[in-house]
Amino acid sequence: MSEISPKDSEMSATAKAEARGLFAVCIEYFAPRQRLKTAIPAVAHRVGITSPRRARAIYAGEARRIESYELDGLRAAAAKAEALRTAAQLDGAAHALLAIDADFHRPEIDRLRRLACELRGIADQKRPA
């Protein structure tokens, strides 16, 4: 008879908590105005979780275990969301400097735009679309 060691259940609880947090980050970025009932399956499809029921179980913390491919997909999607969010913030900062004094801040504006472009390129290389 095999028993679950405390270490296994602790790792499982950690994976569940991480998956739920990553799901929340992805929903916030990729489906911000959708109801959870539609946002969870939309994000799940994006990260490669094919079953809406499985996605809801992971989000609710009810899944018995989290597969590595599911966690990897969620991590990649969350990283992409963070990169795109940061790129948008850099663009906003460049736009603000442009409104203040475009000639004076030109080197900084160009640098911010270049960084934003690089971040978008990195985000496009992440697995989930």
What positions do the PLM features span?
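Basic, amphipathic alpha-helix used for nucleic-acid engagement in HTH/winged-helix/SANT-Myb modules
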Residues: M1-Y29, D72-A76
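Short Lys/Arg-enriched helix C-cap and helix-to-coil transition segments
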Residues: I66-T86
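Charge-rich, solvent-exposed alpha-helical interaction surfaces
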Residues: L22-V25, A39, R46, G73, ...
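Recognition helix of helix-turn-helix/homeodomain-like DNA-binding domains
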Residues: P52-R64
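Short, charged amphipathic recognition helices of the HTH superfamily
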Residues: E28-R46, S51-P52
